[in-house]
Amino acid sequence: MIENKIEQNCALHTNKNLEFLCLDCKLIPCCTLCISRGGEHHRHGIDSLESIQTSSILSMMNSFKDVYPKVIERIENDQQILKDSDEIFNEIQSQYNKNKITLNQEFKKIHNILSILELDIERQLTTDFEINTLINTTITSSINNDIDNYNKNKNNNSITDILNISIKNIQQYNDDDYYKIDSNSIELIKQYQQSLLLLNNNNNIDNLNKLKEYNNQTIKFDNQIINDIRSNLKLIYSFENNNNNNNNNNNNNNNNNNNNNNNNNNNNNKKTEKLNIEIDENNFKFIKKQNKKYYIYSENNEFPKNEERIAFGEGCGSLLKVNWNKNLKNVMLLDGFEESLEPGILPDGIVHLEIFDIKTELAVGSIPSTVTSLTFNDGFNQSIEVGIIPSSVIYLDLHDIKQPLKIGSIPQSVQDLKLCNGFSQPLEPGIITNKIKTLSIHEIKTQLQIGSIPNSVTHMVFYDGFNQLLSAGIIPEGVSWLFFFNIKIPLVVGSIPQSIYYLVFSDGFNQTISPGIITNGVEILCLRDIKQPLEVNSIPKSVTNLLIDSGFQQPLTPGIIPNSIKELALGNIKTQLVEGSIPKKIQKIILDKNFNQSLEICDLDKSVEIRTNYLK
């Protein structure tokens, strides 16, 4: 029996009372709705609480005794989860507020840059307008002054009428008579003087010349550059996931984000050189790379003997049959290659090896220890474990490989590393070893960060298509030689470290070299066919040796080449030298055989040493 005064509402249906125990569900209490059609306990065996047996209620209580500690544990766990959730959310909220502050601060910087640029342009417009205003004021004042001087001597009668009357009166006198000068004559004499003064001054000529000094300018904006800037603004930020458990997802998301940005801004990605199969006069198949023939090997077909370059592809058969070829120096393993690569299969003596998307797993010893130059081409889809690349390799090229590198993947022997078009694997600190001396970077998709490039690197080249912002610290202070080709993101102050001694802006470089971009550590500067004009102070005073060559065609107006230059080398330049292009007291000028201009216009000091040499 149930006491009437006790509330017995169902937890699922609060307007109904608990009346039954479900015999099929561990004696869980139920109401009439629980057992009705659509209820969770419909057609289950039930026992009424009004007539429940002692054994059933005892069984339920014992079951509850077992369940209750789990409920307590569940509540405690939920409370801990709630606490953790609150802490995480509070941290997220705090970070959200910080992010908003950072966002506002960074965009304020951008707004300030744009405001300064706008003020500078407005200042130029104002200066030009003030000059035009001065010209207008000068002309107006001069002409009005002449008109005022002329008008103040006029009376109500016209000058012509007065002159006619005076001449008629004078003609009545004999030539020898004395003429009595009246007031009209005095007026005419004064007016005559004023007229002669007006005609004899040079104001008219000066004013005509001043008309030519007017400068009516129209401001124009380069929409292509504006669109590039708009697109590149998407590269100035990224989102980092701060959850410790999601680091891998974070890396993947960041890489995908960077890849998308790169794809959006580079629709003309350069691909690895396409390899087409050709047939020579002896009916031997070959492919050509960098104008060199690699004959395609197959054990079932005739093959030229003693070839220095061989390519092995899908279905080529065992490589053991080529071990006799002592001339073999260059090998390609093409897409689909699936033959054994156990140690010793590739013969010693190979010095250059290129590996594409092969199906055979590389093992330690697969690559001979004679290989000094190694390339992993687009599509290579294996993990490069420690020891796969032998310690004989000095030159390593990495294209669009599909597995991330590990610390130790690149051996300490590698001194020259090329990251080629499409390379997209993370470059966490330590991936590139501290033995690398020369690093060449093409149009890669992975984002460089501070620490990606070790301090051991002394020579760096950024090739066409590189499209990342080189913020301060990306290029480490150990680099002393730096080359730029047609990179896509403008350099900023700090992009070039103070350690750079030798700097080259090579063919196609299309960024503005504003003052401060080139650091004061640079002593040797080479300018080739760059696409943007230089400014005064673009070249810092630290530069003592300047080489201008290879079709350079930007104006060399006075002041562009600073007086600090001691030695100037001139090659095949397209721009015309003018007086002041070269500092008059420069110490030495070296002229290449392709230089075809006279230096007379530069009016150089007699002390300047001029000699002819071949530029390198």
Swiss-Prot record:
Pfam families per UniProt: FNIP (PF05725)
Protein name per UniProt: FNIP repeat-containing protein DDB_G0290639
Coiled-coil residue windows: 239-274
Region span, Disordered: 241-270
FNIP repeats: 337-379, 380-421, 423-464, 466-508, 509-550, 552-593
Composition bias type Low complexity, residue spans: 241-269
Superkingdom of source: Eukaryota
Swiss-Prot/TrEMBL keywords: Coiled coil, Repeat
Keyword set includes Cell wall biogenesis/degradation: no
CDD domains, sorted: Bbox2
InterPro entries, A to Z: FNIP, FNIP_repeat
